[in-house]
Amino acid sequence: MDIRKAYLDFFASKGHEITPSSPLVPDDATLLFTNAGMVPFKSIFTGEIPRPNPPRKTSCQTCIRAGGKHNDLDNVGYTARHHTFFEMLGNFSFGDYFKEQAIAYAWEFVTEVLKLPKDRLYVTVHENDDEAFNLWQKHIQKERIYKFGDKDNFWQMGDTGPCGPCSEIFYDQGQEHFNSSEDYMGGDGDRFLEIWNLVFMQYERSADGVLSPLPKPSIDTGMGLERVTAIKEGKFSNFDSSLFMPIINEISKLCNKTYVYESGASFRVIADHIRSSVFLLAQGVSFDKEGRGYVLRRILRRALRHGYLLGFKQAFMYKLVDVVCDLMGGHYTYLNEKKDFIKEQIRLEEERFLSTIENGIEIFNEELKNTKEIFSGEVAFKLYDTYGFPLDLTADMLREKNLKVDEEKFELFMNEQKARAKASWKGSGDKTASGDFKNLLEKFGENHFVGYEKAECESKILALLDEDFKEVSTLKDAGWVMLENTPFYATSGGQSADSGFIAKREVLDTQKFFNLNLSFIKAGEELKVNDIVHARIDTEKREQIARHHSATHLLHHALREILGSHVSQAGSLVESNKLRFDFTHHKALNKEELESIEKRVNKMIINSSEAILENMPLEEAKKSGAIALFNEKYQGNVRVLTLGESKELCGGTHVKNTAQIGSFYIVKESGVSAGVRRIEAVVSKAALEFVKNQLEELSKVKDELKNNDILSGIKKLKNEILSLKNELKNSSKTELDSKNIQGVEICVKRIDNGDIKAMIDDFKNKFAKAVILLIQVKDEKITLAAGVKDVPLKAGALVKEAAQILGGNGGGRDDFATAGGKDLSKINEALKQSLETIEKAL
């Protein structure tokens, strides 16, 4: 049973809009990953954005719980139900239906769709929620409803804000399978398993803890797909379900060891962690030394260490990507699109770690001999620093020995290293590199960007650096220049850098390193520290960049206006000849939406609105309605740009009036990752060039069609194609030789031309009972097809047998199937075998 589909279809039938899973990396600065189904709707629940229309949503949300506050990493593999990656089924009502319908829907789905036995179901409610208690009695006996306090049955998002009582549905896995003293409703045993949590968000909690009723209460429910699948399939562990066993079986095949649950923790760790790794990589998270990328690295390296225990000495995790994509790519189609990339990234990370893991484990085992209770923090740091063992991996290895690591000493060594290493010194730049940046900051402080007001200026050279970012006193080769005052804008916020000249040296790039604005120059005449030089930007390039940057602001406004306020910027690139804007949205834009957006942007351009730039405190800017981006870090006063109806925080360069943008054309719309779309567009000179190219293409089409009326020419061409197709179809209706055996018309032969499917359909239509298998060769490629009508023989099996003789494979329905082959020399053998198979079956 496809529970994911059944759930979404069920709630769609109840008026819920199906919302695709949002990205695992949320637009929420307080979260490392999306860790619950309600996260994408958080702004609606908190009232930051209006209630959507329709006010009913349902989703299957991918979630990660590893790192941060919600971290299940250490438990994965050792329990039946902990996962780093899981799918959360949920239905949501934003001020629409409330308890009565939420309870009724849940009961209907569990008992009528999942068909779970009613005598195995129990319910909990909050001890003060008599309304929910009474509503449940319409569906289940009073004796099966339990009341608990705030700890178990009250949910809140934070210390303040929306909150409310919740009701949970439990499934009794059977007394005969459990014997713990905690196996009772409300106990810590595994017999009674919570499968669904219904949150009744009916209060607002103030800072002083007072609960006030919400005028329009909401519903937020969550049911783990892995858990409910295991229950439906009669398994006591999620890992024994159909969601995991294909992965575990593949691991077993690769290591040539049989999976046994009692000793199979390593199998389970790997099966869980490959799912997390695949999804995180597919959604743009990459292996890194910090942040989300480091969590991904920890997950994979923990799996690799368990692989080592199973005997894997070479990269193997990447070989599991195919089975994950086979299992989940049908619903999450982007997995298949990025499969090759994911496999390559995992393989490279495996090879990095496997090159050191053996030596690291030797050091670990040696220290283990000297450990009674607490493992040395110094050795744990050495494992981390030299051999790439994350601290929690060392802790995981010690857990198996009932030992702990000295985390305090580990942190001491970590802090000492940070204090010593310049590369670990952090600033707020857009680009990181190792170099003499800290020395420069200590000597000079931050240099000054004067490019908002000036396109050129006289300035003193404060420092020169070679290509490796080492300070030099003179520079003739290519390298970096730090000016006291610089007109060159550094790559930041998606806007590309200025170019131009410093003295006679061409500036190719400008970047920020820890708030130092440095320009990269070509080799040329010698420059010296303390020289006074003339710096000037390429004003034509700057103007074109400004036009494209201002257009991104108008585009962002148009997207939010036309698609909805859920749209937010997920990335951008602004260059002199194009712009690229990534934004959150759950589906591809259709032609009408794109036309509306393009039209809206051009209207704002034509309105000739003056650009208004203001500097103000961040909170004041937010109160004024200015849009701030989650992934940007703002400090002190911020720069607010108003362009007509658009108002955003931005440090880039812009036009003075929207009319300067010229024309705006959308060139392409595409998907970036789950829940993120991309628009590419051009303005000004690039827009004129785009239109010119389009007209030239149309002219070429006219020439090819030999018709100035393109639509008429295409229509004529379509008619000709249709006519040729009909001729081809008619030619395929050639009489096929056949013979009759016991009232069944049989045809097995090779054909050279014609539509093979049409020929089979025609043959089947002529007879009451028929079996036909045809083999066709075109361009050295073999195509097989079989059809069966009212005969106890399966077309899929028939065509598969023939294809295997020809070195291929295939299959299909019982009445029609296709396959491919490679070995032309065995066609006669395949025909002969197929005929024998048919005759035997009759």
Curated annotation (Swiss-Prot):
One term of GO molecular function: zinc ion binding
Cellular component terms per the entry's GO annotation: cytosol
Natural source organism: Campylobacter jejuni subsp. jejuni serotype O:2 (strain ATCC 700819 / NCTC 11168)
Protein name stated in the entry: Alanine--tRNA ligase
Record's comment describing the protein's domains: Consists of three domains; the N-terminal catalytic domain, the editing domain and the C-terminal C-Ala domain. The editing domain removes incorrectly charged amino acids, while the C-Ala domain, along with tRNA(Ala), serves as a bridge to cooperatively bring together the editing and aminoacylation centers thus stimulating deacylation of misacylated tRNAs.
Cofactor: Zn(2+)
Gene: alaS
Record Pfam families: DHHA1 (PF02272), tRNA-synt_2c (PF01411), tRNA_SAD (PF07973)
Cell compartment(s), UniProt: Cytoplasm
Cofactor note: Binds 1 zinc ion per subunit.
Any one GO biological process: alanyl-tRNA aminoacylation
Keywords on record: Aminoacyl-tRNA synthetase, ATP-binding, Cytoplasm, Ligase, Metal-binding, Nucleotide-binding, Protein biosynthesis, RNA-binding, tRNA-binding, Zinc
Domain of life of the organism encoding this protein: Bacteria
Family: Belongs to the class-II aminoacyl-tRNA synthetase family.
Gene3D superfamilies recorded: 2.40.30.130, 3.10.310.40, 3.30.54.20, Bira Bifunctional Protein, Domain 2 (3.30.930.10), Threonyl-trna Synthetase, Chain A, domain 2 (3.30.980.10)
Chief place where the protein resides: cytoplasm
InterPro entries in the cross-refs: aa-tRNA-synth_II/BPL/LPL, Ala-tRNA-lgiase_IIc, Ala-tRNA-ligase_IIc_anticod-bd, Ala-tRNA-synth_IIc_core, Ala-tRNA-synth_IIc_N, Ala-tRNA_ligase, Ala_tRNA_ligase_euk/bac, DHHA1_dom
Role summary: Catalyzes the attachment of alanine to tRNA(Ala) in a two-step reaction: alanine is first activated by ATP to form Ala-AMP and then transferred to the acceptor end of tRNA(Ala). Also edits incorrectly charged Ser-tRNA(Ala) and Gly-tRNA(Ala) via its editing domain.
Binding site for Zn(2+): H549, H553, C650, H654
EC number of this enzyme: 6.1.1.7
